[in-house]
Amino acid sequence: MHGIIVAGSTGEYYAQTDKERIWMMNRCAELIKNRVPMIVGTGAIRTEDSIGFAQAAKAAGANGLLISTPPYAYPTGREIALHALAIDRAANLPAMLYNYPGRMSVNMDAETLDRLGRSPNFCAIKESSGDINRVHMLARDYPHIALSCGMDDQALEFFAWGARSWVCAGSNFAPEAHIALYRSCAIEGDFAKGRKIMSAMLPLMSVLEQGGKFVQCIKHGLTLRGIDAGPPRKPLQPLNKEDKRQLAEVIHTMNKTISNITGEAI
């Protein structure tokens, strides 16, 4: 693991009060103790709120920011860029952009990316659109913005196109499997082994993306690992017994299969 993101989508930032979010930044900084970089999400509808979170993150000792498009507002490419640049001016920290049109309704388009080239702080992008053509475009046209996989079932393709980071919620409870795929593809360049590992991971990815149960699955995955992450924030509800059984079975099978592929115990 090379870093920890606080207040991302999986962290349920959208269901927390401002006070809770700022407390979480500071608490995570205390626990991480500079062992790995801490990146803090600034997501909010209002630019002013995102700026406030960015400044609080810097005060907490964050090493970088995660900057997404404002939800619901449906801003243009120019407006997204102005939003991100305002956050950048306020905090002056390295920033990973977060493109997630499935939740935010808009893409960070070429106009956005071109305008953000005004600041060297925009050094990476977590691409979660699911559109493989955007992966091609980012790798080809914006090589100065490091490509990070934000769509788990496309991890192999991201690595093939040069991505050297993967922001993956499943790694919270199954780090060994995710690291095995990352190591095989991004470090060793062994895509033959990577395809085998990816094939073993796809059932888990299908369970996580079954619709409306992503956060609940992550939290229960942590419970299976002996970590109490608490219930999901309302309106979300915990998994039912059958969902829990299915998740546990899929994780067990995945770990056993990947262990056989890599020769390392999980």
PLM region descriptions:
Residues 1, 160-163, 170, 174-266:
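C-terminal alpha-helical cap/extension of soluble enzyme domains
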Residues 89-90, 101-202, 206-209:
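Catalytic alpha/beta core domains of metabolic enzymes, predominantly
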Residues 28, 57, 87, 125, ...:
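Conserved, mostly hydrophobic/aromatic
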Residues 21, 25, 50, 84, ...:
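A general structural signal for well-ordered alpha-helical segments in protein cores
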Residues 1-105, 261:
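Active-site beta->alpha loop and helix N-cap motifs at the rims of alpha/beta catalytic domains
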